Amino acid sequence: MIYYLLVPLVAHFSALNVFRYITFRSIAALLTALVLSIVFGPKFIDWLRRLKFGQYIHEDVAAHKQKAGTPTMGGLLIAFCIVVSVLLWGDLANEYVWMTLFVFLGFGALGYVDDHAKVVRKQNKGLTPKQKLLGQIVVSGVAAALLVLDPEYSTRLAVPFFKHLTPDLGLWYLPFAMLVMIGASNAVNLTDGLDGLAIGPMIVNAAMFGLFIYVAGHAQMARYLQVMPVSGVGEVTVFCGALVGAGLGFLWFNAYPAQIFMGDVGSLSLGGALGFLAVLCKQELLLIVVGGLYVAETVSVILQVGYFKMTGGKRIFRMAPLHHHFELMGVPESKIIIRFWILSILLALVGLSTLKLR
């Protein structure tokens, strides 16, 4: 909105030319989302308390019982701040911006239904796994189809550290892109079990993929760094900036001890958006590295369930996802969170190194 109001005036006021730059508008979106989060956060938390939208806690983790009743569905605050910031600072004529918002809000709507069902039923169960998966398939399928049907969008796959290895998946790219989005969404959802555990790495991941998206959308940079170019995708950097800002603002209240939880409306939407960002900048496989924390949490659940079924009741971990295993080992929650954040930053640096190590 601001973009369209001020850019036409550049001919009269040259200083306004700064609003043409994606980098400036991305920083502006970050600051806008951050301020909105911090300003509206307390009022939003009070509103959730009045509605009695409290979190129902996993009974198997005794230390979590004190968190019962903490306001949930904080993802609505994140969504509000991101959408407002993108609408203010983004180029709304860019199709990739709208596609990203569609995925973000689509997965968020699914999470909202799930959260609302939990609140109404007064238990820690919402949608069934099949219902949730069906919704994810629909949202990711529409987004992936729009990309595959775009003649200017490549269905080639970039392999980290190998600049000349770019296999073309053709129509198989559609289910692959869907898998990336659904997998990322569920992975973030599984990770969201401790105060600030999911949002911290999300901020790091959003910043990292914001950089890759900016490079992919800049023809000269993409050529120099040998990254697959995607014309027009650079504008989505504004969304990434807004996500980082909203994430920082939410962390202000979600840090241990949390005053609010993001709920499924937050974890599913952020995870789905993260997967789509990786797809947009042609760095789908890099998400496994940069989002390694989310991958580890998901793999721990898969291994636990599989081993439990194969052995008739035996377990690899004391509890899955992985963060609960460390909790039951006696590691303080705050220490688990900080250590996982550190690992996330290190993994992001490994991902960043792929820009030159090819």
Curated annotation (Swiss-Prot):
One of the record's GO molecular function terms: UDP-N-acetylmuramoyl-L-alanyl-D-glutamyl-meso-2,6-diaminopimelyl-D-alanyl-D-alanine:undecaprenyl-phosphate transferase activity
Transmembrane segments: 27-47, 73-93, 97-117, 133-153, 165-185, 196-216, 233-253, 260-280, 285-305, 335-355
Subcellular location: Cell inner membrane
Pfam families, per the entry: Glycos_transf_4, MraY_sig1
Keyword RNA-binding: no
Membrane topology: Multi-pass membrane protein
Protein name as annotated: Phospho-N-acetylmuramoyl-pentapeptide-transferase
Organism: Solidesulfovibrio magneticus (strain ATCC 700980 / DSM 13731 / RS-1) (Desulfovibrio magneticus)
Gene designation per UniProt: mraY
